[in-house]
């Protein structure tokens, strides 16, 4: 069995071989060193996400010595269980509507065109640094109503929070730096939230402050932490997923040519990449009581890792799962999670990705990855390139 090979080793190739073996022989497995249980099969993962009463996202409630800081967890939908999760999600959904997201289309297109235009004469670019990193920060910053002058600051915070590696988590200095960076961002968002409370505008933060369901509103901590979640999760997902798409198309030139010729295939291309090369690798839960999964008995108070990257390649659920097929119905993938914690920002990410791909296909007649070997993040829970150099030709 051994230890899981790092994704960063070879872009997940060795890891996927290892995961296939785990699904077959050890689908529910407890790691001796970390004592964390991992679920590797699609069915077990989705049954866990569908049962938040047993598989809780409020890790701090059930783990001895874990600090439940309301100021940090309030409004963080990913760390919340029903019934509060339902209320907060309803309140957020009133403001973060499909209409609000759709209204961003012209701005996303303009931002993507501007970013691509800035590098078009070079004949080469870093997909991450030049396009997929700044795009979501600019879009989400605009959605939240944050000052244009602060965009580089926001991007820097997001990059710093993504850039620590797995091994760094044991380093107290690194952990403090991560915590300090997170606090800086929260403090910044709190100042902006208080400004909007006294001077509301037509932006998401103002709408979150005003949102009401059954006479209940979001607290200040909840507004601040949701803005933080949207900024960080929205940034990471779109940044790495666009890079993952470009990388995957480079490996499958016939698919790239097909999608370029028929732009109606782009939505299917995005969904299949979310399955084939997801950004969010796993998610944690904690058991609230003893539960049987497969043939294993998990006691109460156990940390459980849901291996989305493994579930997305489960042979029992997806036909020929190691084949990249943009014509398959991949919508049941776990790339945006599953159950009550399915990504609220998924429509925005899909819109950004579709527009960015369209813009790249329109501007460039040929795109080729040149930065080999690719430098991957080794950050826990996410998978994607730290940078991705490409060369291109104009139409």
From Swiss-Prot:
Disruption phenotype: Abolishes the production of epoxide cyclomarin A, leading to the accumulation of the olefinic cyclomarin C. Its EC number is 1.14.-.-. The keyword Oxidoreductase applies. SUPFAM superfamilies: Cytochrome P450. Cytochrome P450; part of the gene cluster that mediates the biosynthesis of cyclic heptapeptides, known as cyclomarins and also of cyclic dipeptides, called cyclomarazines, which have both antimicrobial and cytotoxic effects. First, CymD catalyzes the reverse N-prenylation of monomeric L-tryptophan with dimethylallyl diphosphate (DMAPP) to form N-(1,1-dimethylallyl)-tryptophan (r-N-DMAT). One of its GO terms (molecular function) is iron ion binding. It is an enzyme of class 1 (oxidoreductase). Keywords: Heme, Iron, Metal-binding, Monooxygenase, Oxidoreductase. This is Cyclomarin C epoxidase CymV. It comes from the Bacteria. Belongs to the cytochrome P450 family. Pfam families: p450.
